[in-house]
Regions:
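Outer-membrane beta-barrel translocator/receptor signature
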Residues: 129-132, 144-222, 229-235, 327, ...
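Acidic/polar loop-and-plug regions of large Gram-negative outer-membrane beta-barrel proteins
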Residues: 209, 226, 232-334, 342, ...
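Gram-negative outer-membrane beta-barrel transporters
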Residues: 409, 626, 632-637, 647-756, ...
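C-terminal beta-signal and adjacent terminal beta-strands/loops
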Residues: 678, 748-754, 773-821
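Outer-membrane beta-barrel proteins
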Residues: 174-182, 204-230, 234, 245-249, ...
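Repeated loop/turn-to-beta-strand initiation elements of outer-membrane beta-barrel proteins
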Residues: 195-198, 232-237, 340-343, 384-388, ...
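Structural signature of Gram-negative outer-membrane beta-barrels, strongest in the C-terminal barrel
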Residues: 378, 387-467, 499-638, 652, ...
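Acidic, small-polar-rich N-terminal luminal/periplasmic segments of exported/outer-membrane proteins
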Residues: 25-166, 616
Length: 821
């Protein structure tokens, strides 16, 4: 509360009101008008840490307003592909917690603070109850935030603000096919007019699903209190709590091209057989008809024929379940020292408790984890005079008279001055993560989904013995996991190989940063940022074999983030920019913790995941900002994490174009297009099997067994799971008498399911439409999602394409009633 004390001491001071082009904006946070979708109508201070218009931000950025979130029906991390370029997201493990940007898991921020708690997009689903708008920024996070391994981009969730003018309330209820039931209550207003205001939002869901045995039950509460005791100080306290019980949906297994094209599914059960046909036991089966170096607990499938599968029949046992509880709290203080100086302090607490449990013995547990962070920023905005007309010839003039002569006819200061926007600060983050997973025993292809779903199960005995066994998680009944460390006997026998996910870690991150935007002229500006982090980590293995001490490891590492940018206003309506960004980051374990290498140490290469980004673009603002167009092209080097395998370097090229047009309050249109070329050049990626056919005995397959992780030969591989091209469009029109229509389209180019492209999802499209009527304080709305009932598919995981594929939702009708008071 240092800023509060400073504000108290300055309470009797009067803040200067002299004009200046670089003066700071008032502390009051201004939002967009309710139906405005134009990025040009507000600043994006949380994108780069400075109060900049979207045309001045040297990066590709999308601003998704409340109006767009509602009309495009944004409910999950995947739905951003409906409204923004380069945001196609796989169904990672059936319920992604993070959006993908430019083909990689994106960072998620909460009012400019990294939430964390995710690895490869696995974690608690995004809770939109607290969200007012979303900034989607392409490329690594800037110096003020520090980069992570997720350098494709980040989304920043901007929370709801209190109502300071009068009391407002809103009740929403949505009902839809497949037993969908969602509801929200939102209210707030001033407590002390002009001084103290609040807002509270509650949302809940009690929904079934189109998919067999899948459901969602959630409760969320958000509250914010804003106190403005003086004109130069503001305190905002907020808390977002969410609890969700849901089902992990991993899609359909045995993804052949015939399944994708025609819905044809190969039937048959896992059989433990050898070449003579003699049955054998499950613990060390000689089930592979082709020799392998991994005689693990796996089997082969004896095909019995083919059938047209019901797309609702997914890999879910009725006894499977998932759970997540999150709590994010912030205290945001703003102290205006003068027109040109402001202190901003953001204190954050994050809590996560989650688990995912499948009867096929995929499990993930985070129990619990929490983060404490405090970031202090000093913003200094000044005009530095370089030259101006001499007034020495007028010595008899007073100071005020000289000031008048020092202005031109427009009121602007004559001469040349350099504008400077400076942000410097300190950041401390403490993180505690306890996380255990078992990713070694997921035998997806061995289950026949046309049979009783209760048979989707792996016996506990089969994961407790054999190679790389699982162990009971201490203090958590019914959960088993494999170690994060590697355990070898004195004779050299490997008992366990570290899974790269399980970790019990304590981490402290100390950082300092500086950002400086120098406006050399009204047209030309340079922007520099640098941040240095000192990261200390203590690791202990949460599970380990009997007779062994748990593996421990410690490290202290330095990380750096540097970026340089230039913007040039070609015309009043056109701005060009170029950016270069270099960063190093750590390799994350599950739950946002840190994993160790196969040598049971923190390997230096795991803290040298380098990223280089070169990006250039043009931004246009026509008709007083009512038409906004942005284009960008980029080249980036980065690292791609693999499940249970080393990260891989990747080079990507791409381009994006976005258009926002809103000529009046009745109509708006958004369009976006992106092209991405993510290539792993001369790399040897790992994959669950060489082909889906490895699971089947000849003549249908090779009979090598499943799972049977292979390392592919070195070569050039297109990253699977991501379309090279994505296009979306959204149109909305409302008549003056209240009737309105909305339309949305999303088109994806072919998507490889595997690295070799043996199975390909073809070009697909999804069309959504809605009709609504607004009368006074009531809105009635009907949405038809996928109204052409396309039988679309999506990737579940970038390296599990031989095991599973996700059937997208069919046509669905939803009805919403919204009442405001």
């Amino acid at each position: 509360m240092l800023l509060l004390l400073l504000a108290s001491s300055a309470g009797g001071q009067t803040v200067s009101t002299s004009s200046g082009t670089q003066s700071l904006t008032p502390v009051t946070v201004q939002g967009l008008a309710p139906n405005n979708i134009l990025p040009t109508s507000t600043d994006v201070s949380d994108a780069f840490g400075l109060d900049l218009l979207v045309t001045d931000v040297p990066r590709s950025i999308s601003v998704i307003t409340k109006e767009e979130l509602q009309n495009a029906n944004i409910q999950t991390a995947r739905d951003f592909a409906r409204v923004s370029a380069d945001t196609y997201t796989p169904y990672f493990n059936g319920n992604p917690s993070s959006t993908y940007i430019r083909g990689q898991v994106a960072d998620t921020f909460f009012n400019g603070i990294r939430i964390g708690f995710t690895s490869e997009g696995v974690g608690a689903p995004i809770d939109f109850n607290a969200v007012e708008s979303v900034d989607i920024v392409k490329g690594p996070a800037p110096a003020v935030y520090g980069a992570s391994q997720d350098v494709g981009g980040f989304i920043n969730l901007i929370t709801k603000q209190p109502y300071s003018d009068a009391f407002h309330s809103e009740i929403d209820a949505t009902f839809g096919e497949y037993n969908e039931n969602r509801y929200t209550i939102d209210f707030g207003g001033p407590i002390i007019p002009g001084k103290l205001s609040y807002r509270v939002s509650y949302s809940g869901e009690e929904s079934g699903s189109f998919y067999r045995n899948v459901f969602t039950q959630s409760q969320s509460v958000y509250a914010v209190l804003k106190w403005t005791p003086s004109s130069n100080y503001e305190l905002e306290l907020l808390n977002s709590f969410s609890e969700i019980h849901y089902e992990l949906n991993r899609g359909i297994n045995r993804p052949t091209q015939d399944l994708i094209d025609n819905g044809t599914y190969i039937t048959g059960r896992e059989e433990f057989v050898n070449p003579t046909g003699t049955p054998i036991g499950p613990n060390y089966p000689i089930s592979n008809l082709i020799p392998t170096t991994i005689p693990q607990n796996r089997g082969v499938v004896v095909p019995t024929g083919t059938t047209q599968i019901d797309r609702a029949d997914v890999i879910v046992n009725p006894n499977d379940s998932s759970y997540a509880k999150t709590d994010y709290a912030e205290a945001i203080q703003r102290l205006t020292l003068s027109d040109n100086a402001q202190l901003l302090d953001t204190a954050y607490f994050g809590y996560l408790n989650r688990w995912q449990l499948g009867s096929y013995h995929y499990s993930a547990l985070v129990e619990p984890s929490y983060t404490l962070e405090d970031r202090l920023e000093l913003h200094l905005n000044n005009d530095v005079p370089v030259s101006r007309p001499s007034l020495d010839r007028e010595p008899e003039l007073s100071k005020d008279e000289k000031s008048v002569l020092d202005k031109d006819e427009t009121g602007e200061t004559e001469g040349w001055s350099i504008g400077n926007m400076l942000n410097l600060g300190l950041d401390f983050r403490y993180q505690r993560v306890y996380s255990v997973s078992d990713i070694s025993h997921s035998y997806n292809n061995l289950f026949d989904l046309t049979q009783n779903p209760s048979l989707i199960s792996v016996p506990l005995s089969s994961i407790l013995g054999g190679k790389n066994p699982s162990y009971a998680v201490p203090g958590v009944n019914g959960f088993y996991g494999t170690p994060g460390g590697t355990y070898v006997t004195s004779s050299g026998k490997v008992i366990n190989t570290g899974n790269g996910e399980s970790n019990d870690t304590w981490a402290e991150d100390y950082a300092a940063f500086i950002e400086d935007r120098i406006s050399v002229t009204k047209q030309l500006a340079f922007f520099f940022g640098i941040r240095g982090d000192i990261l200390h980590i203590d690791f202990i293995d949460p599970v380990h074999p009997a007779g062994f001490n748990p593996v421990t490891a410690h490290t202290t590492q330095g990380l750096i983030n540097v970026n340089g940018n230039v913007t040039y206003q070609l015309f009043p309506w056109a701005t060009a920019y170029f950016t270069y960004d270099y960063s190093t980051s750590s390799t994350d374990g599950q739950g946002g913790g840190y994993s160790i290498g196969s040598d049971n140490k923190f390997d230096n290469p795991d803290f040298r995941n380098g990223s280089d980004l070169y990006e250039g673009g043009l931004k246009f603002s026509f008709f007083d900002g009512k038409l906004y167009i942005a284009t960008a092209g980029f080249r980036q080097t980065r690292s791609i994490p693999q499940e249970g395998a080393p990260t891989l370097p990747e080079i990507i090229w791409g381009g994006e174009a976005e258009l926002n047009f809103q000529p009046n309050r009745n109509f708006y249109m958004t369009l976006s297009y992106s092209y991405l070329d993510p290539v792993l050049a001369q790399q040897a990626p790992s994959q669950k099997e060489s082909s889906v056919l490895a699971a089947f005995v000849p003549p249908v397959g090779t009979g090598s067994g499943s799972p049977n992780t292979v390392t592919l030969p070195p070569g050039n591989y297109l990253q699977p799971g991501i379309p090279r091209q994505l296009f979306n469009a959204n149109l909305n029109y409302v008549f003056d008498f209240g009737l309105g229509f909305s339309f949305g389209a999303e088109i994806t180019s072919p998507i490889n399911l595997t690295y070799g492209g043996s199975v390909v999802i073809p070009t697909q499209f999804t069309l959504n439409a809605g009709v609504f009527y607004r009368w006074k304080n009531v809105e009635l709305r009907v949405d038809v999602l996928n109204f052409t009932n396309q039988q679309n598919w999506a990737v579940v995981s970038t390296n599990n394409g031989t095991n599973q594929v996700y059937p997208e939702m069919p046509l669905q009708v939803q009805g919403t009633i919204r009442v405001k008071f």
